[in-house]
Amino acid sequence: MVIISASGLLYLRHCEWSPEEAARYATEHAEKKSVGMCALYVRKAIIAGGIPLYVGGDAWSYKYTLPILNFHQVGKKSEREVGDIVVFQPIGGRKYGHIAIWNGKQWVSDFKQRNLIVHSDYLNNGCEYAIYRRDR
């Protein structure tokens, strides 16, 4: 079934989600360091995981997009699962926020992150973030 949301988001409501494929894609296509395109790289990983996503947007906008795609918010202290996606709010010089996907070992955005928090702006300012998961 094709759905067009109020925001104009077009996607298939009943599609097979493979978090493993999404995480694999993200890991294989990650750059050596950030190129400032985390939202694009994670969007491509979501598509590789089986969800046709036809709109982009900045990282922070995914806090609205992911629930439309049947992702639900999970607790920050819950155990990570492959395919979990973290979305950070914009803060300081990071006006678009940040987004990454968990591959089972590390967070991956446009690069393989060493930690969940990738910049001191997020660490020092108590930045808000949310983690999303889609059940199969």
Model regions and ranges:
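Cysteine-nucleophile amide-bond enzymes
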Residues: 1-17, 47-53, 68, 75-85, ...
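N-terminal capping segments
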Residues: 3-57, 95
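Intrinsically disordered, low-complexity N-terminal regions enriched in serine/proline/glycine
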Residues: 10, 24, 40, 53, ...
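Aromatic- and glycine-rich peptidoglycan recognition patches
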Residues: 11-13, 17, 27-30, 75, ...
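...with weaker cross-activation on analogous glycine-rich loops/strands in unrelated enzymes
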Residues: 54-119
